[in-house]
Amino acid sequence: MDTKMQSLPTTHPHPHSSSRPQSHTNNQCACSHHCRSCSQAGHPSSSSSPSPGPPTKHPKTPMHSRYSPSRPSHRGSCPKNRKTLEGKVSKRKAVRRRKRTHRAKRRSSGRRYK
């Protein structure tokens, strides 16, 4: 009877993941979050040993949390970005003029290349 009970739960999740492949990808997101808190609570002293390990997953967490608040903050930085863009555009125009002279020189070398 014990073996049957153990076999039941093991077979249950198997068909579950197979029938729901999309859910698997969604679960991965929640899994990584769970894994983080699990690994931190499960390996408190180990956290100092695998220093290079957690840092790789660490940046992923702030990225996710930054995405949500970054949307509203982006709107505020939009005008700032526009100002920098305008400055860059005017600079680019001057560079483009210079590039045109370069292009004329390149044309002669381009003929040779052809």
Swiss-Prot record:
Region Disordered, annotated ranges: 1-114
Effect of residue 109 to A: Large decrease in phosphorylation
Ranges of Low complexity composition bias in the record: 16-25
Positions with a binding annotation for Zn(2+): 12, 14, 16, 24, 29, 31, 35, 38
Residue list for modification Phosphothreonine: 101
Pfam family, one: TP2
GO cellular component: a single term: nucleosome
Consequence of changing residue 38 to A: 50% loss of zinc binding and loss of nucleolar localization
Basic residues bias locations: 90-114
InterPro entries linked to this entry: TP2
Distribution of this protein across tissues and organs: Testis.
Effect on the protein of changing residue 68 to A: No effect on phosphorylation
GO molecular function: DNA binding; zinc ion binding
Location of Phosphoserine modifications: 109
Outcome of swapping residue 35 to A: 50% loss of zinc binding and loss of nucleolar localization
Stated consequence of mutating residue 31 to A: 50% loss of zinc binding and loss of nucleolar localization
UniProtKB keywords: Chromosome, Developmental protein, Differentiation, DNA-binding, Metal-binding, Nucleosome core, Nucleus, Phosphoprotein, Spermatogenesis, Zinc
Motif Nuclear localization signal location, chain numbering: 87-95
Subcellular location field: Nucleus; Nucleus, Nucleolus; Chromosome
Family note: Belongs to the nuclear transition protein 2 family.
Role according to the record: Plays a key role in the replacement of histones to protamine in the elongating spermatids of mammals. In condensing spermatids, loaded onto the nucleosomes, where it promotes the recruitment and processing of protamines, which are responsible for histone eviction.
Designated name of the protein: Nuclear transition protein 2
